[in-house]
Amino acid sequence: MKRALLSVSDKTGLVSFAKGLIDRGFELVSTGGTHRELAAAGIAVTSVEEVTGFPEMLDGRVKTLHPKIHAGILARRDDPDHMEALANHDIQPVDLVCVNLYPFAATIKRPDVTRAEAIEQIDIGGPSALRAAAKNSDSVWAVVDPADYEAVLTGLDQDDAHLRQKLAAKVFAITAAYDAQIVHYLDPEPFPEHFTPTYTKRQDLRYGENSHQQAAFYVEPDPNPTSLAAAKQLHGKELSYNNIKDADAALAMLREFSEPAVVAVKHMNPCGIGLGKTIEGAWDKAYAADPMSIFGGIIALNRPVDLATAEKMHKLFLEIIIAPAFDDDAYAVLAKKKNVRLLTINTADTPAELGTETTAIYGGLLIQTRDNQTETPADMTVVTTVKPTDEQLKALAFAQTVVKHVKSNAIVVAQADQTLGIGAGQMNRIGSVELALTQAQQNDNFAGAVMASDAFFPMDDCVDYAAKHDIKAIIQPGGSIRDKDSIEKANQYGIAMVTTGVRHFRH
C-alpha cells in the first residue's frame, strides 16, 4: 500500500483530497490538527507517533523529524541498497507529502505580534519534509498548495512525471520565499550581505514595454495598501506593462499631497498636476496644465471621483483612472467606455512611500533608499537680493516637490497649485528649461510663475533664459562652482532665487 504524509496549516480542501488519496490506495499518516480534522470526518488515518514510535514533543516543535519519516521519503526506489536499508529498519516508503507551512507572514503582519510569537511560526519540519519529497520527485509527490489538489489526483491516475517535477520546483520556490520572509523579519537591514527578495506572480502580461518583449507582473507577499499591487480593478482591459509602470509613477507623485490632488502621467513623467479645494478643481488645474499631453494619460486622484469630475474626464481618452472610490453615478459615466481601466486604491492622505527601490542591471542589482526628501520653505536659503514672497515660496515648494519625480535633467514651471510646463529627460539643462517654458507660456495662468531645477545650474544660461521668459523666482540645489554666476544673473533681472542643498536626480 502506498503511503501519504499529510500535515497542513491550511485545511482548505483537505478532507476531499484525503478521500481522493484513499480511493487511490493510499494509507494516510498525519500529525496534530490535521489528524484530528481527518478523524473527525470519519477518515482512516494513522498518527505519526504510531509510525515513528516516538511522541510529538517540545510543544509540537518535533513531529515529523524522524528517520522513519525522512528515510521513507528520501529513499531512491531504483537503488537496491536504499530499499534494503528501509526493509532492514522496518521503514515503509512515503510516496506523497502534502504539507503547507506555518503562517509566518500572516503572523508578523499583526501589529501587536511579539518576537516569541513570530519565532513559533517558523516552520522547521514542514519545509524539511517538503524539500525531501521534492528532492526525490522522481518517485515522490510533493504537494504544498491546496490549489494543486485536483491536479495531483488526476496526475496520480496518469503517473504524471512532468507534474511531479513541476510541483517539486514549486516547493523549492515556496520554501525559498518562506525563508526570505524570515530573513527580512529577523534582519530588516536595507542593505544586507545577501539580498533575497520574494515575489509571487500576479499575472502574465500580453507583452512587455514593446510587443516583441515578454513580461509578467509580480507582487510582494504583503504589498503596502497604498501600492499599485494592492489596487482593485473595477472596469476595463487588463493592465499592460506600460500601464503598470505609469500608474506606479502616478501614485508615487500623488502620495506627496494631502490636499485634493490630481496627477496626470505620460511615459512615467507628470504632464499635469493640480491641487484644489475640491477634486473637481484639482482636475481642472491638472487638465489645463497640458491639455494636449493628457490625452491617453494615466490619472491618479486622492479623493473619490464625483459626477462632475467624471463627466469632464469622460470627454477624453484616458488609459487609467485611479482613485480611492467612484461615486455610483460617476462610475456609470466612466464605465461607458469599455477600455478605460478604473482602479480603486487607498490614495487619500497617504504619506510619501518609504523603504528601498531596486534597479536591475545586466549581471546585478542596484538598491537605494527612495527619494523621500521633501523641501519646505524652512529648508530654503535665499541667495539673491530679492526675496520671494509668501505665495512664491508656496509655489517654489510645490514645484520642488514635483521636479523630483521628473526624469533628469528636470525643470518644472509652476504656480502654487498647478504645473504649467515640464522639461524632462534632456541631456543638457538648458534644453529642459526651453521645453518647460515653451509649454508654460501657453497657459493663461503663467503670469508670476516660478521655476524648479532638480540639480544645480552649470552656467548662468538657464537663469538668463528664464528671466527673458518672465520667471519671477527659482529654486535649485546650488553647489555648482559657477553658482555665483547664476546668482548674479538673477540679481541682474530682479529674480528671487533660493537654494536647498538637496539634489533630486531621477534616471
From Swiss-Prot:
SUPFAM superfamilies: Cytidine deaminase-like (SSF53927), Methylglyoxal synthase-like (SSF52335). The keyword Ribosomal protein does not apply. The gene is purH. Its EC number is 2.1.2.3, 3.5.4.10. Pfam families: AICARFT_IMPCHas (PF01808), MGS (PF02142). GO terms for molecular function: IMP cyclohydrolase activity; phosphoribosylaminoimidazolecarboxamide formyltransferase activity. InterPro entries: AICAR_Tfase_dup_dom_sf, Cytidine_deaminase-like, MGS-like_dom, MGS-like_dom_sf, PurH-like. Belongs to the PurH family. Keywords: Hydrolase, Multifunctional enzyme, Purine biosynthesis, Transferase. Pathway: Purine metabolism; IMP biosynthesis via de novo pathway; 5-formamido-1-(5-phospho-D-ribosyl)imidazole-4-carboxamide from 5-amino-1-(5-phospho-D-ribosyl)imidazole-4-carboxamide (10-formyl THF route): step 1/1; Purine metabolism; IMP biosynthesis via de novo pathway; IMP from 5-formamido-1-(5-phospho-D-ribosyl)imidazole-4-carboxamide: step 1/1. The IMP cyclohydrolase activity resides in the N-terminal region. SMART domains: AICARFT_IMPCHas (SM00798), MGS (SM00851). This is Bifunctional purine biosynthesis protein PurH. It catalyses: (6R)-10-formyltetrahydrofolate + 5-amino-1-(5-phospho-beta-D-ribosyl)imidazole-4-carboxamide = 5-formamido-1-(5-phospho-D-ribosyl)imidazole-4-carboxamide + (6S)-5,6,7,8-tetrahydrofolate; IMP + H2O = 5-formamido-1-(5-phospho-D-ribosyl)imidazole-4-carboxamide. GO terms for biological process: 'de novo' IMP biosynthetic process. Gene3D superfamilies: 3.40.140.20, Methylglyoxal synthase-like domain (3.40.50.1380). It comes from the Bacteria. Signal peptide: none annotated. Residues 1-144 form the MGS-like domain. One of its GO terms (cellular component) is cytosol.
